[in-house]
Amino acid sequence: MDSGLYPKTGAPTWFYGWSKQREGGFSDFGSEIFRLRALPPLKAEIFRGIREVVEYNITGDSHPGYPWCKLGSDNKAVLTGFGDLIWDEVAKRFNNMLGYGDAIFSMTPSELVQNGICDAVKVFIKQEPHSLEKVNAGRLRIIAAVGLVDQIVTRLLCMKQNNAEIDCWESCPSAPGMGLNDEGLRTLYSTAQVMAEHGTICETDISGWDWSVQQWELDSDARLRTQLAGEEIGGYLNFFLRVHAYVVGHSVFVMPDGEMLEQTVPGGQLSGDYNTSSSNSRMRVIATMFARYLAGQVSGFPLLGIKAMGDDSFEIWFKGLEEYLGKMGHTVKMCVQRPGLVGFEFCSQVFLGLGIAYPVDFSKTLYRFLSHHPADPKYSEYRAQLMYYFRHLPSSTLQKVIRLAGARVERAQKLATSSN
């Protein structure tokens, strides 16, 4: 895959300063030679310059994961009360990686946790509306809450690259930085128009993408991140990124009742991992590029012929797309070709033209709005956000939304009255 379409950033500043003070190379990891030549262990003080930035960008009200949930109910509480402890653990995590070296890649998920390479991952059902079909089938959306220390480790390694991709989303095959404002919608539609000059645009729906990610795809993402940072394959940064890819695909899961389950089949992307949006986007691009190669199809299209935001994508269709994605472990639930871009969909939006799109399904957005109490001080702000999100809905559909919302509110009021 041509990494030239992704922004090149250089290594993280803290890492560059630290690694240049060390001697030896990756081939010495875990050996007596390496230990004798290495400087003293990495300490939390080296992160002093970036600590504030990292903590500012961490979502404060998110779950801190296991075992840090024992210290506080959310990230903010844990960092406020135990910040120094957390950063000491971050430094210890890096030192544990260096201490075990290549032996990490033969560890079981349980051994990774026991040896302090990573923490177990807390899983729970996402608090959002699920369709009756999914409820009856037991296909509920599972969230994997990665522990706070692991979140910080990943941010230290990947924040610089992830932010660069967000800033460059218009010219990059990955689009984590895309917006659904009118300018963002125009850019996306223009991109689809350019691609449509080279073939028919299609959109695909991969069944359970996160759980279908293969270990080699996680490893490929780590390799590309190393190249984009301008670092050597086999160097320190590459080693840390390889470890991250390995622990993501070899997890211990903590159930809500405390039961722990060890992953036996490598692979899968953790929904709560800091890299999920960025890595899923890149791996979705990699999957199409590999499928195209296996199908013997030409490449060299604008943006590699695909635009991806997480597992959502639109791309130039080719014969064998569904077949070869399936052979790679990604079951294609739906592949719709859109000749002339008529009604093409991306990120749950139906595009009608340049800068015009509306939600495919408005029910979840409406549900979230109705969950706010009218007495909430920000209620008018929430309403304005809702109407902006629905700004391009056809008038008949918008009236349907308003009637539906009114009916739901009336029903809720009756239920509340009867219960009292």
Swiss-Prot record:
Residues 199-325 form the RdRp catalytic domain. It catalyses: RNA(n) + a ribonucleoside 5'-triphosphate = RNA(n+1) + diphosphate. GO terms for biological process: DNA-templated transcription; viral RNA genome replication. Its EC number is 2.7.7.48. It comes from the Viruses. Coiled coil: none annotated. Might be cleaved to release the mature protein(s). One of its GO terms (molecular function) is RNA binding. Keywords: Nucleotide-binding, Nucleotidyltransferase, RNA-directed RNA polymerase, Transferase, Viral RNA replication. RNA-dependent RNA polymerase which replicates the viral genome. Belongs to the ssRNA positive-strand viruses RNA-directed RNA polymerase family. This is RNA-directed RNA polymerase.
